[in-house]
Amino acid sequence: MFDNKNRFVIENYNKQSCFASFLPGISGIHGTPLWNFYVNRGQAICSFGSENKDHSIMEFYPAHQSYQFTKTMGFRTFLKVDGTFYEPFVDDDMPHKMYIGMNELEIEETNEALGIKVNVLYYTMPNERLGGLVRTVTITNLAGAKKDVEVLDGMPALLPYGIALKDMKETAQTTKAWMQVEDVNEKLPYYRVRIALADAAEVSEVEAGNFMVSVNKNGEKLPIIADPELIFDYDTSLTKPVNFYKTEVLALAAEHQLCANQVPAGFACAHEEITDSHTIYSVYGQAGTKELFHTFANAGLDAAYFARKHEENDAIINELADTIATTTADPVFDAYCKQTYIDNVLRGGYPVKLPGGHIFYVYSRKHGDVERDYNFFSMLPEYYSQGNGNFRDVNQNRRSDIYFANFV
């Protein structure tokens, strides 16, 4: 049931009964949170974004549609292993697993015929001025001989900043005319609308943007394809990467891209000779300005940086959960206690003592997710983040605070 990291394990999750969940979106007091929802289908993440549904990076869908669309519209990985095409997490008969941690999610698939294993790890980037979802894709060579591997990894639809949920649900065809991606050739794609989508006489400039950046272990930025037609060609269902079948991936990335007037994609490209393993590190997020994004992306993103951020991510959630650390004869019950406490923190907040004796509650937000699609949740993209909530949610936690945080 649990692995050696105390993560819950689900074997062959694509064949199990549907369920939906979320990463807690806790990025530390001095971090910027994102909301992230996942289901046990495809590559798991079904939607994510900043603040609320009107700031989606991957479009928000309610649960029943997430179960249908995640294999296609969620994250995708296309591989050519010694010339043989393979898309992991699509064939339900291929052995695969899901590992669910308190503040991370990992999926794994093993292809014995090709002699490779693919692991994808997700966690929210902690302690940064901008919010980001970290996605690391590791391809492990299970055979003795070196393998030639081409990789195309990312999202078939990455929404530009400035598009509300209503725009995508009601007028998406019209809204495409505002969409654009900048700086693709610099390997720093910045997704935003040209001008604000407002029926007003005054034109408003949009500074903020959604972004992605992908690097290898040495911190070298990878080429990005933002034009979905360059990958899928005539296949408008986005099922088959038609051009990837017949074109070497780096040559494909070097071709001309149409970066406006369509829903853009976001795929990183790599071509490697793999003896042991190879990892692609990607961050998908939102920044208040392009300058802030460039400062972040050029600050030494390499394997050591992501290892450090992963450790910080674990430390943040464990510090909260240790408040209710329980030791019994049943480790499942002990883990349940920690998870229950984290769930309560998310609903009613975690008390922090400020100078002057003031108490401030961080991390609270209304319990909206893909199943509770009626709730308009909000998580402010700022330090000491908190969100909207119901009075009953706050009161629920105040009863337990007198025991777990007696300074209140």
Predicted regions, residues:
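Anionic coordination/interaction segments
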Residues: 1-408
